[in-house]
Amino acid sequence: MLKKLITTAVLAMLIFTLAACGTTLAPYDAKKDLGEQINYTITGIDAGAGIMLATQNAIKDYHLDDDNWQLQTSSTAAMTSTLQKAMKDKRPIVVTGWTPHWMFTKFDLKFLDDPKNVYGNAENIHTIVRKGLKEDKPSAYQVLDNFFWTAEDMSEVMLEVNDGVDPEEAAKKWIKNNPDKVAKWTDGVEKVDGDEIKLTYVAWDSEIASTNVVAEALKQVGYKPTIQAMEIQPMWASVATDAADGMVAAWLPNTSGIYYKDYKGKFEDLGPNLKGAKIGLAVPKYMTNINSIEDLKTSK
């Protein structure tokens, strides 16, 4: 009798496990409330990112918390992986999105309208250097001050990296293929002989691209650059405390605004190296009736 009960229990557990493994979220259904289909979850990235803070504000300002919407912390890689899997089966998903980023080139995505302007207007990505860099390393200062490119330029490098190319190799390829643009950063800059320079960055795809490219440009005038990835707050602190020489990863005025304010007076802002960046919530274009953050609310 005991043996029969154990066998029955094992079979029941096996059936349950197989059923669970075979369960996947259904394709998007425009006739049903979105929240119910994705457990009222927005798929996000690193907890300290400015877009995550803005999204927490969006949940409150649009009263999404009334429906118990939540923001799931992960990483950029995990978020894009989840997005890719969802879109393969045309499942519903809401993610924190920003441009420039390769996901907007590779996938058919759209930003949700933000009528309350919680995410702010278009952002620019600034170059920030430590105080005294102009005097200590004038050639590096000049290259960093000259560094400017477009969202399309950045996307080229990001797509290469996403396809498996090493970031340094992708940067070298872009430098080789764009001599006229690079010349605008390096022409007239006095060369050095192996002087060291340290750049820090947050490990977002966009900043991996820009930091590796500017490091290659610095090599062209004789520098030996070191680049180090870290979280966003330590990145700002590294420049403000002279632990690093600079970074090209300051999304302003929104994403990095809090850190700009916290460390103001302890760094030099060289201005934008890329204009027209944007952050917000994004969904696949096949979610045709979800066009605004307000559309996330449960229908009454």
From Swiss-Prot:
Name of the protein = Glycine betaine/carnitine transport binding protein GbuC
Q: Name one GO biological process term.
A: carnitine transport
What is the regulatory mechanism acting on its activity? The complex is activated by an osmotic gradient or by low temperature.
State the membrane topology: Lipid-anchor
Molecular function as annotated in GO: amine transmembrane transporter activity; carnitine transmembrane transporter activity
The job of this chain, per UniProt, is described as: Part of the ABC transporter complex GbuABC involved in glycine betaine uptake. Involved, with BetL and OpuC, in osmoprotection and cryoprotection of Listeria. Can also uptake carnitine when carnitine is abundant in the growth medium.
What Pfam families does the database record attribute to this sequence?
Answer: OpuAC (PF04069)
Lipid anchor positions (S-diacylglycerol cysteine):
21
Lipid-carrying residues in chain (N-palmitoyl cysteine): 21
Subcellular localization(s) per the UniProt record? Cell membrane
Q: Quaternary structure per UniProt?
A: The complex is composed of two ATP-binding proteins (GbuA), two transmembrane proteins (GbuB) and a solute-binding protein (GbuC).
